[in-house]
């Protein structure tokens, strides 16, 4: 039996409530291949961050399992790097030392020069250098802090990179710049990424597939949308691809209308459970081609 790089099987998370257990999400099953960039989108409260915490080993599911490279995830590991929206930097250390701290933990046998050179290389990859690496987080802008956080995550060369709305607190210009840098780094390193976002345009720019969650409680992963657009992707050109707006319109329609229509009930029947365990695979760009619109190309394997 062929195994996928990341396998999520029938995840559920429940929390104690005044009237019994509250089921945030249930029967979440999906896979991610090595080198794939997958985004997950859904309204606040549907359990996206909780799923990410389970993948990171920071939380345990109420039901279900997560396997990475055939091994069940049961706790935190340097094989999984996490970037949070709030940066999570050590305030008493410089940008460089925030990265070297992680690198030393990953490779304790490296000498000081190896650690420093490796860390500085990743800071340069995200546009930090020429003295900025010596500043403490309080001396950096929000965008620069997030660059440090991203550099730290990439520097430990994790098998899986987890991004929890990493650009949500940034202004539009800074967010766009760092998104472009992330695209370049992921294309160069073939990094496997799972990312939470509320921004449909960001998801289309970055992802190979987009998972769509219904509203909570009893949230489900309803669809897996293929982003059938060519790489490398440039934000100045991607919006002109005939496949772009079919994908975007599909995502917006789900968030505005269908996410609520499909939400709010337990999977009491076999039909409901089958739907929850097997997200519908959707390819809006291909469907647009079949309807007579000509996309400029199919997504290339990374």
Specify the residue positions occupied by each region the protein language model found.
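Conserved catalytic motifs of ABC-family nucleotide-binding domains
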Residues: 157
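Conserved ABC ATPase signature
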Residues: 136-140, 144
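The feature captures the beta-strand-to-loop junction immediately N-terminal to the Walker
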Residues: 41-43
């Amino acid at each position: 039996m062929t195994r996928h790089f990341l396998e999520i099987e029938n995840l559920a998370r429940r929390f104690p409530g005044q009237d019994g257990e509250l089921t945030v999400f249930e029967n979440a099953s999906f896979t991610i291949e090595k080198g794939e960039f997958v985004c997950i989108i859904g309204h606040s409260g549907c359990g996206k961050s909780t799923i990410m915490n389970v993948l990171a080993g920071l939380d345990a599911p109420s039901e279900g399992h997560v396997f990475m490279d055939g091994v069940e995830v049961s706790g935190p590991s340097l094989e999984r790097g996490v970037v949070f929206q709030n940066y999570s930097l050590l305030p008493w250390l410089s940008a460089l030392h925030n990265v070297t701290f992680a690198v030393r933990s990953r490779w304790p046998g490296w000498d000081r020069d190896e650690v420093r050179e490796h860390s500085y290389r990743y800071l340069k990859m995200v546009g930090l250098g020429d003295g900025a690496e010596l500043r403490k987080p309080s001396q950096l802008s929000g965008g620069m802090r997030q660059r440090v956080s991203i550099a730290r995550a990439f520097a430990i060369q994790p098998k899986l990179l987890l991004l929890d709305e990493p650009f949500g607190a940034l202004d539009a210009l800074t967010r766009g710049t760092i998104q472009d840098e992330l695209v370049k780094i992921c294309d160069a390193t073939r990094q496997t990424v799972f990312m939470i976002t509320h921004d449909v345009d960001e998801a289309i720019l970055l992802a190979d597939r987009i998972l769509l969650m219904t509203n909570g409680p009893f949230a489900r992963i309803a669809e897996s949308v293929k982003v059938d657009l060519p790489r490398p992707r440039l934000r100045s050109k991607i919006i002109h691809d005939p496949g772009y707006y079919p994908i975007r319109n599909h995502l917006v329609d789900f968030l505005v209308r269908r996410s609520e229509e499909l939400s709010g009930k337990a999977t009491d029947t076999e039909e409901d459970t089958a739907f929850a365990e097997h997200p519908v695979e959707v390819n809006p760009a291909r469907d647009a081609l079949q309807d007579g619109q000509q996309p400029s190309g199919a997504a290339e394997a990374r």
